[in-house]
Design a protein with these regions (language model features):
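A short, N-terminal "cap"/entry segment at the start of jelly-roll beta-barrel domains
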Residues: 1-40
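Ligand-binding loop in jelly-roll beta-barrel domains
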Residues: 88-112
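Short histidine-centered beta-strand/loop micro-motifs
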Residues: 48-53, 69-70, 95-96
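Short, conserved beta-strand element in jelly-roll/cupin
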Residues: 52-68
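Short acidic-glycine-tyrosine-enriched beta hairpin
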Residues: 72-89
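Conserved short histidine dyad/triad with adjacent acidic residue
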Residues: 34-53, 87-90
Length: 112
């Protein structure tokens, strides 16, 4: 990965893309810097991801709360100000929220 010069991100200027869950929707605002992806993601009320994700992430909860469920049945509750970290192909996981949540998600080759 090459050096990233100082820059600011005005999330109000980043286009939202819609992604359907098993229930509810996710809205992504994505910045791609080489192999580094930074997303501000909003899950609507009663959102359940439609797949088990195997990608590594750093996930920080900006607003609301959600459950990160692992494929082995473990569940972790996260709320505003909390973060989780997982590497690629270590723990398949999915997100669930009843009230909606706003997350900052960072992923890339550094999590392999």
């Amino acid at each position: 990965m090459s050096a990233i010069p100082f820059q600011t991100i005005d999330w109000n200027q980043i286009i939202k893309t819609e992604h359907h869950g098993e229930t509810g929707n996710a809205y992504w605002q994505t910045i791609q810097l080489g192999n580094l992806r930074i997303r501000k993601v909003t899950y609507t009320e009663n959102y359940i991801a439609d797949h088990w994700c195997q990608k590594g992430h750093i996930v920080h909860c900006l607003e609301g709360d959600f459950i990160s469920e692992l494929e082995n049945g473990e569940k972790f509750s996260l709320s505003k100000g909390m973060t989780y970290i997982v590497s690629d192909d270590v723990s398949s996981h999915r997100s669930i929220t009843t009230k909606g949540v706003e997350l900052l998600i960072i992923d890339g080759d550094f999590l392999k």
